[in-house]
């Protein structure tokens, strides 16, 4: 069995935007999958809100305040935009608060409001990325994990997506961002970690790393 990551240690402070950058196969997505409970590490711990996530089933991590926007968007193509968004709120019970969150998501993503009854599979790539982000925000997360949000998008959509990530951060949500577009990620991050073959080889303030090429 290939070991994708080894000896990785990093921290994310509340309210930060943290970027994990590196080439394909560096282990970035594996880290996100491990943090969100999709993979179980052989050893080590992942602490969130004072609890070790390794000991908590993945499906319960969402209700603790963590949301994951997967690589490739992974929207439910045969469901409407609205149905996709409501899937993001499945751990929540208060209908009034869910409705308020939905309005906030629609304010942030006007295209989704316009297309709320449209099948998700008919949206453009950029719109599907917005939907995946909106779906994650419907869980009202404390931290949101984003995996390659710029993948396959036109430059215009990339700029729009990164503007929205900054808005999400400013609203108080912590962001852990995996991104191959290093310059774009570093331009909005507070701090960053650079991965090579499953190990962190560089870390520091994003502005310092951006100027360091």
Positions of the model-derived regions?
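The feature captures the beta-strand-to-loop junction immediately N-terminal to the Walker
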Residues: 21-23
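Conserved ABC transporter NBD signature motif
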Residues: 44-52, 64, 97-102
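Conserved ABC ATPase signature
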Residues: 119-123, 127
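A short, proline-enriched helix->beta-strand linker immediately N-terminal to the Walker B motif
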Residues: 138-142
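ABC ATPase signature
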Residues: 79, 123, 136-137
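Helix-to-loop junction immediately C-terminal to a conserved catalytic motif
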Residues: 36
